[in-house]
């Protein structure tokens, strides 16, 4: 299956959104259709989602007005109601109770063969969205560049900017998740990629955001041999997770620190997150300093243990909508060379495709 790309160099936020919406019209229709079915599974009808979309757009406009304008442009270009696209950008908040199975490994330069920090993650999500995501390269008129792997119609997710700030993303669950909608985590990720010029700026932006859906956002940069830190955001407030003494940080889908840990629901909903964390930590501990390469880290994630304990997920034929978890993509972030590499599928079936701006133009 082809890796979908889109390149943007429009001068205005609205034009950027309109052009993307028109170019990705069919893919956006696919994505909004799947989420419509997922909303319905959670008891939300079209009127409920529209109301939540309006609420989300107001929150986005207050936090990042330029991204609110971009979302309005995406809606216009794709022929979708603006509240539908706003709700799509807040789908984590609307479906806050849904499970997810993403695994992240990040290493400081002391552990890698290149001597530079490295971030790797699997993105596990609904199989029905296998053709609903893309790699989006954005060149702003002031020279800033952002590359993000995201679902069509959503302004950002996992990514890298030209200043060497990389973001990885894992869903979490907290008992206080829920309405009213806070800053949508996908909008937060894009804002960080747009704005941050280093690890401190990224961490400050993430920690300051008032969210209503919990996530672990891992920041990886190449500053002074690498900076790696996960911010666990939740309605209870932020917490920070740093690498262990060997220079490795592993995160899955449960809180590791307070204040979020006291209200964690991820372990109850998917206890396999504990096993994934343990397996990844043990496999990384078996590697010596200076030995970690992208290939070695990817190989460590090719685990197919059952249920939510698998780091490389494949759906079963009889799995129902909402339960067909699949590793849709595997991502390698190398901040030292400003490169985000996206592999379609899981670690056991990767097909590489560089997401450099030059590749995105092709």
Where are these predicted regions, by residue range?
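Short, well-ordered beta-strand elements within core beta-sheets of diverse protein domains
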Residues: 188-194
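Internal mixed beta-strand/loop scaffold within catalytic domains of large alpha/beta enzymes
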Residues: 90-179, 183, 187-188, 328-331, ...
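C-terminus-biased signal that marks the final domain/tail of proteins
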Residues: 1-101, 194-228, 235-236, 243-362
């Amino acid at each position: 299956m082809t890796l979908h790309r889109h390149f943007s160099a429009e001068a205005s936020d609205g034009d950027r959104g309109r052009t993307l919406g028109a170019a990705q019209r069919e893919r956006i229709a696919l994505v909004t259709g799947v989420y419509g079915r997922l909303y319905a599974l959670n008891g939300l009808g079209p009127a409920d989602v529209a109301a939540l979309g309006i609420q989300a757009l107001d929150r986005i406009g207050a936090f990042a007005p330029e991204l609110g304008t971009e979302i309005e442009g995406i809606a216009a270009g794709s022929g979708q109601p603006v509240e539908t696209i706003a709700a799509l950008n807040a789908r984590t908040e609307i479906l806050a109770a849904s499970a997810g199975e993403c695994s992240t490994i990040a290493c400081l330069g002391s552990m890698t063969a290149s001597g530079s920090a490295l971030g790797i993650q699997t993105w596990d999500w609904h199989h029905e969205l296998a053709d609903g995501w893309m790699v989006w390269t954005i060149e702003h008129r002031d020279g800033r560049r952002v590359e993000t792997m995201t679902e069509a119609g959503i302004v950002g997710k996992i990514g890298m900017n030209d200043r060497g700030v990389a973001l990885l993303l894992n869903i979490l669950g907290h008992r206080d998740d829920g309405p009213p909608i806070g800053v949508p985590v996908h909008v937060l990720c894009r804002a960080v990629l747009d704005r941050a010029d280093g690890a401190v700026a990224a961490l400050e932006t993430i920690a300051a955001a008032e969210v209503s859906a919990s996530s672990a956002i891992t920041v990886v940069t190449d500053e002074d041999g690498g900076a790696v830190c996960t911010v666990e955001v939740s309605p209870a407030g932020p917490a920070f997770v740093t690498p262990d003494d060997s220079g490795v940080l592993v995160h899955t889908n449960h809180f590791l620190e307070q204040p979020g840990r006291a209200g964690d629901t991820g372990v109850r909903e998917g206890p396999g997150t504990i096993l994934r964390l343990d397996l990844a930590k043990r496999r990384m501990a078996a590697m010596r300093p200076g030995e970690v390469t992208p290939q070695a880290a990817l190989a460590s994630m090719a685990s197919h243990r059952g249920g939510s304990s698998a780091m490389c997920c494949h759906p079963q034929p009889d799995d129902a909508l909402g339960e067909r978890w699949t590793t849709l993509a595997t991502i390698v972030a190398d901040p030292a060379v400003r490169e985000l590499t996206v592999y379609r599928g899981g670690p056991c079936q990767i097909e590489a495709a560089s997401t450099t701006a030059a590749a995105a133009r092709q």
